[in-house]
Amino acid sequence: MSELKDCPLQFHDFKSVDHLKVCPRYTAVLARSEDDGIGIEELDTLQLELETLLSSASRRLRVLEAETQILTDWQDKKGDRRFLKLGRDHELGAPPKHGKPKKQKLEGKAGHGPGPGPGRPKSKNLQPKVQEYEFTDDPIDVPRIPKNDAPNRFWASVEPYCADITSEEVRTLEELLKPPEDEAEHYKIPPLGKHYSQRWAQEDLLEEQKDGARAAAVADKKKGLMGPLTELDTKDVDALPKKSEAQHEQPEDGCPFGALTQRLLQALVEENIISPMEDSPIPDMSGKESGADGASTSPRNQNKPFSVPHTKSLESRIKEELIAQGLLESEDRPAEDSEDEVLAELRKRQAELKALSAHNRTKKHDLLRLAKEEVSRQELRQRVRMADNEVMDAFRKIMAARQKKRTPTKKEKDQAWKTLKERESILKLLDG
């Protein structure tokens, strides 16, 4: 019985959590079927109730762990005390019992520790000596409820939108209102390039020139005679379209046929004017044969235009036929500065960009104006807070005088009235 009285256990009375009162939402969810589920609006309430249950369970667990530790330490301490008491008795020289000579050996080795013998305590009480602890009946700490940080995160995210406007933000708005240096670059229309038909014609001429030069090189290796007649420089490719245009402008010096007639013949007849004609002999200009027939084959006579009747009517007839067959459009290709689909779309998008830029600039001006007004209001609110502090100081002085049962001085009253009037004037400016 004495051991039970000395037991340090406190035997706490655990109070169970009333789920119906403390956790009504949790109880209602448990009573539902699986098909009903949980609504989103119930999650916050369920979280708080589950945290309450968790804190209660944690509190009980900590109390039980503390009781277990107290019981273990008390048992260890009890065994150490019995062991020390037995050692002290042997050191004092207690008379041994008759018929047990081994007791002397135990007395001789009392300083080193108890040896085996019949006077040895039971093995369950003989435990190695451990450090003694002093146990005090301190109140058990209540476990902290887990902190719900969601409101703090919410207000931290909202704070930048509700904070006061600074001068740096006003300067940022002013810099945004400055027109960018490259604004004009966005409204420039690039010049129209060369038409694909002209570009392809020039590429074809360049290809013909390369083929002719290659064929001329082969002919030079074989005969060595046709080389000078078929050589063509790369600069002649650019000169050929110009020469063709000059011939069309001056039909009296060139071909009398129109452009459509020439294009139709070029499409129907395959001709390589640059590649050498290997089978054609070189005419011999010396001799008697050049006397009579030389006039018809001389270079001077070759440059003279020959006359073909009805070239204009042929040109118009070919044009009408090509339009009727759908091979040619009735109108010519528009000029470079005329409207086309790409240019119309580009100008449309540029107009939208200008309208959007003007709208943004207007909104930025309004925002800058409102920001400056808000800055002035912030200064007035700061003055109101300072006036409130002055009014509270005057009020404390008057209340201290009344507590001391004395009448406030005229100076204190005047100061209080002055601060009140200043505060009212600032509030009028703030409301106006």
Swiss-Prot record:
Residues 211-223, 232-251 have a biased composition (Basic and acidic residues). Its main location: nucleus. Keywords: Acetylation, Coiled coil, Isopeptide bond, Nucleus, Phosphoprotein, Transcription, Transcription regulation, Ubl conjugation. GO terms for biological process: regulation of transcription by RNA polymerase II. Signal peptide: none annotated. The keyword Nucleus applies. Residues 295-305 have a biased composition (Polar residues). The modification N6-acetyllysine is found at K418. The modification Phosphoserine is found at S280, S298. GO terms for molecular function: transcription coactivator activity. Residues 40-69, 367-407 form a coiled coil. Functions as a component of the PCAF complex. The PCAF complex is capable of efficiently acetylating histones in a nucleosomal context. The PCAF complex could be considered as the human version of the yeast SAGA complex. Also known as a coactivator for p53/TP53-dependent transcriptional activation. Component of the ATAC complex, a complex with histone acetyltransferase activity on histones H3 and H4. Belongs to the NGG1 family. The PCAF complex is composed of a number of TBP-associated factors (TAFS), such as TAF5, TAF5L, TAF6, TAF6L, TAF9, TAF10 and TAF12, PCAF, and also PCAF-associated factors (PAFs), such as TADA2L/ADA2, TADA3L/ADA3 and SPT3. Interacts directly with TADA2L and PCAF and also with the high-risk HPV oncoprotein E6. Component of the STAGA transcription coactivator-HAT complex, at least composed of SUPT3H, GCN5L2, TAF5L, TAF6L, SUPT7L, TADA3L, TAD1L, TAF10, TAF12, TRRAP and TAF9. Component of the TFTC-HAT complex. This is Transcriptional adapter 3. It comes from Pongo abelii (Sumatran orangutan).
